[in-house]
Amino acid sequence: MTGPVLFDFGGTLDADGVPWGERMYRGYRAAGGRAAPAAFDAGFRESDRLLALMPGIAGLGLSAMVERQIELLRPLLPDGRAVDARAWAAGFLGAMRVTAVRNLPVLRGLTRTRPLGVISNFTGNLRPCLEELGLLDCFDVVLDSAVVGLRKPDARLFQVAFTAFARSAEECWMVGDSPAADIAGAAAVGCSTCWLAPAERPLPAGLTPDRRIGSLTELPAVLD
C-alpha cells in the first residue's frame, strides 16, 4: 500500500473547504437571523466553548450535537430566540449529509490502496459523528483532540497519527481546510499537504500547500 492520508473532519469531510462557523452563519441567515458576522462569530465561539464542557458530549452523534449547539448559540445572539432552530439545524445537517454521501465513494476508493485517518480538533465525540455520516468504517485511525489531549497544529498530535500508522511524516498526506491547523501544522512536521478550499478563497500569505483542491472528489488524481 502507498502512504497514509490524514483528513480533517469539519470543513473537509463534510463540506468543500468551508468551516463550520461560516456554514452555521449561513444557516442562521437562511433561518431568518440578521446579526452581523462579527456578532455571530463571538457567539459561535462561546457556544463552542460551552458545548465542549457539556456533560455527556462524548456520546452525542452529529444531529444531537448540532441541535445542542444551536440551543446554546441562540440566546447569545441578539435575535437568536426568534430564529427557527429546526430549520437552521435541518439546513446545516442536510448539506453535510449530501457532501458525506458524495465523498463516501472517494474514501472507499482510497482505502483500496492507502490507510486513511482523521485528525480533528473536536469535542470528544468524533467517532459517533463519523458513524452517523456513514464514514467511520473508512478510517483506520481516528484522533479526536479532546480525547488525545492535544490540538492541531501541535506537532505531538500529528506524531500520534504517524506512530499509529507506523509510518514517517514524510510518507503521509494531510488534507484539510484550515491553513494554520491543518496545512501549516502538518507541513511543519514534514507531511505532504493538500489544502481544500473554495476556488475564490485567496491563498494566505506564507502558506505553501503541496496541492490545492476545491472538492474531495479531486483528491485521487492529486495522490496518483
Each predicted region: which residue ranges?
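Asp-based, Mg2+/Mn2+-dependent phosphohydrolase catalytic module
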Residues: 1-3, 7, 38, 80-83, ...
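N-terminal helical cap/lid subdomain that shapes the substrate entry/recognition surface
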Residues: 2-105, 127
